[in-house]
A protein has these predicted regions:
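Soluble, non-membrane globular domain cores that form compact, hydrophobic packing
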Residues: 1-232
Length: 232
């Protein structure tokens, strides 16, 4: 059961391995630390209210690592060495167990269900971005980006200023295995095909898309309001 609910400023997310600049980019204004008793054991959860369900999902993708695994029987939830993460509505939720508390994996799963149930509502699930194609996609490498701050962290060698976030662009990034090689795929979604054409044209001329530059080559194409780039 819930024992403590403590509102905190966004800067406090640093205490929980978060980054205030990233949180703010996804629309987080406050966070709430909650403490629970699971029988005689203790667990904690941090609730961050983002701008909308897709922004909350973006936070989950930004912070997840390839070491994380889906939680059995719970949708849009992952578990890893440092605890679990989950998205419910506009909330990005981190849950963990203090080192001194001997809580099992089943206890942590029970906490996630207590906090957010076994899945998002149909309406919230429908508002999440569609996943990238799964064939060859490295598990949990996909990121959903809504601004320059996150984009610079995920794509440090790319001209992120050309992506068009100021014009409501949304980006998905994923790592793929192609034979023995690893490639980064960037999908840029724009509000209109016209905007996508202008943005893709600018990147095409500035970045030399589809020109053979050896290891620095970038390949791409545009379909409707979506531009797809293969970065390496």
């Amino acid at each position: 059961h819930l024992t403590i609910s403590e509102p905190m400023g966004v800067d406090a997310v640093r205490q929980f391995c978060g980054d205030p600049a990233i949180e703010r980019e996804y629309g987080v204004k406050t966070i709430v630390l909650r403490k629970y008793h699971l029988g005689s054991k203790q667990a904690e959860a941090l609730l961050e209210e983002a701008a909308d369900p897709s922004a909350a999902y973006g936070l989950l993708t930004f912070y997840r690592t390839e070491a994380m695994q889906p939680v059995k029987g719970i949708e849009v939830a992952l578990t890893g060495p440092s605890g679990a993460t989950m998205v419910r509505g506009r909330f990005y939720i981190r849950a963990w167990v203090p080192p001194a508390s001997q809580v099992s994996e089943n206890d942590l799963r029970a906490l996630l269900i207590y906090v957010g149930g076994t899945g998002p509502s149909p309406e919230d699930a429908a508002s999440l971005p569609p996943p990238l194609p799964s064939s060859g996609l490295i598990a949990h490498s996909e990121k959903y980006l809504l601004g320059l701050e996150a984009a610079r962290r995920i794509l440090p060698n790319f001209r992120t200023d050309l992506m068009g976030f100021s014009q409501s662009a949304e980006a998905q990034v994923g790592s793929y295995l192609v034979g023995e090689n690893r490639a980064t795929v960037l999908a840029l979604h724009y509000p209109t095909p016209q905007m996508a054409r202008v943005r893709y044209g600018a990147m095409e001329s500035m970045l030399g898309i589809n020109q053979d530059k050896g290891r620095d080559s970038i390949y791409g194409r545009r379909t409707g309001s979506v531009a797809i780039l293969i970065l390496d």
